[in-house]
């Protein structure tokens, strides 16, 4: 944590936070029932906020659209400005219909069930058949929420660009959704993809055992929904009705390509329509450019006039050199 490191270095820290409560994703990004993890992180934040050399200002957004701009903060007399805001922008795929009614992004759901304003005040209009695009831990949390706490959801369809071997979620997290997995449908899906999986040397029997387990997970009696997978499928466009609401998701069938040990997906030009009425993208976020920092995708922004005496000049050097002093500001 930037504030703790600065305090340990003897600095006086002023912490600006967009939210009222401190914690960021530690507070608003973790599934609500993971009490032990949340309490442990909250204890750390309480200790930091209690430090006599830290001043905390919550409900104060920083950026071009915020209460203060970065330029404003730089005029307040600090010797250094540390931005620890993470990626708060929404990542878009740029496909047709991405702004249709019924299309959401992970933060819309995660911040809603974690009670972060203004997301918690917004309605969450879910249909009966929900597609979640993505195969990471966030997908697990959203599927868990939909199937365990939203009785209106009859089916969650996980749409993955690559195959079961490339799943990104932690194995221990899978136990939260395993009781809802339609094991027969999962086996059928893996067998459907056998030629494409074996073409890159993947063992279907091993994948089947890893994904299906013993099939003995107990489904909660009051949760009738099921979870299915659609692997090797890339979102192509939203299908909408006359009112602009989602009625389906068109996906492109993919094949796997192995290059230098890495497996990637390539489109086949074949398309399939999935009948869903809600689509949630859990594909990560992007930097919010309105924060006011120099931004370039896939690279660091470095000092245009680097210090040649810096031994790490070829690896990294800050854009705005830090001056000597003991007063630091941190944005979160």
Indicate residue ranges for each PLM-predicted region:
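Structural/interface elements that position substrates and couple domains in central-metabolism enzymes
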Residues: 2, 8-14, 57
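Dinucleotide-binding/catalytic capping subdomain of oxidoreductase cores
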Residues: 10-18, 22, 28-29, 37-38, ...
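Feature captures the FAD/FMN-dependent oxidoreductase FAD-binding
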Residues: 44-98, 102-103, 221, 228, ...
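Core beta-strand elements of the Rossmann-like FAD/NAD(P) dinucleotide-binding domain
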Residues: 74-80, 125, 267-277
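Glycine-/small-residue-rich beta->alpha transition segments that form the dinucleotide
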Residues: 78-80, 84-91, 254, 276-289
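Short, well-ordered coil/turn residues at beta-beta hairpins
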Residues: 84-85, 99, 106, 133, ...
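Glycine-rich dinucleotide-binding loop and its adjacent helix/turn
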Residues: 89-150, 301-320
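Internal hydrophobic alpha-helix adjacent to the cofactor/substrate pocket in enzyme cavities
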Residues: 144, 148, 153-154, 321-332
């Amino acid at each position: 944590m930037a504030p703790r490191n600065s305090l340990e270095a003897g600095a006086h820290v002023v912490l600006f936070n967009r939210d009222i409560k401190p914690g960021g994703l530690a507070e608003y990004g973790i599934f609500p029932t993971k009490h032990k993890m949340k309490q442990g992180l909250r204890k750390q934040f309480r200790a930091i906020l209690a430090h006599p050399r830290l001043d905390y200002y919550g409900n104060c957004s920083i950026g071009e659209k915020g209460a203060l701009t970065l330029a404003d903060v730089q005029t307040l007399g600090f010797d250094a400005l540390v931005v620890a805001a993470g990626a708060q922008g929404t990542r878009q795929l740029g496909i047709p219909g991405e702004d249709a009614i019924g299309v959401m992004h992970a933060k819309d759901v995660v911040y809603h069930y974690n009670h972060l304003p203004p997301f918690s005040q917004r309605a969450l209009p879910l249909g009966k058949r929900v597609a979640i695009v993505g195969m990471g831990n966030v997908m697990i949390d959203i599927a868990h929420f939909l199937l365990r706490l939203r009785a209106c959801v009859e089916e969650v369809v996980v749409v993955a660009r690559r195959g079961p071997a490339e799943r990104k979620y932690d194995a221990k997290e899978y136990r939260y959704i395993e009781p809802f997995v339609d094991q027969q449908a999962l086996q059928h899906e893996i067998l459907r993809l056998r030629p494409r999986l074996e073409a890159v040397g993947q063992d279907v029997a091993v994948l089947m055992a890893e994904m299906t387990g013993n099939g003995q997970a107990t489904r909660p009696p009051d949760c009738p929904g099921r979870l299915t997978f659609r692997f090797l499928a890339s979102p192509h466009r939203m299908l909408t009705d006359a009112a602009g609401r989602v009625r389906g998701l068109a996906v492109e069938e993919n094949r796997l390509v192995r290059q230098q040990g890495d497996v990637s997906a390539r489109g086949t030009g074949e398309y399939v329509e999935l009948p869903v009425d809600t689509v949630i993208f859990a594909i990560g976020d992007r930097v919010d450019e309105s924060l006011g920092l120099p931004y370039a995708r896939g690279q660091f922004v470095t000092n245009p006039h680097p210090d040649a005496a810096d031994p790490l000049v070829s690896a990294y050097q800050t854009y705005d050199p830090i001056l000597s002093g003991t007063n630091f500001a941190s944005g979160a």
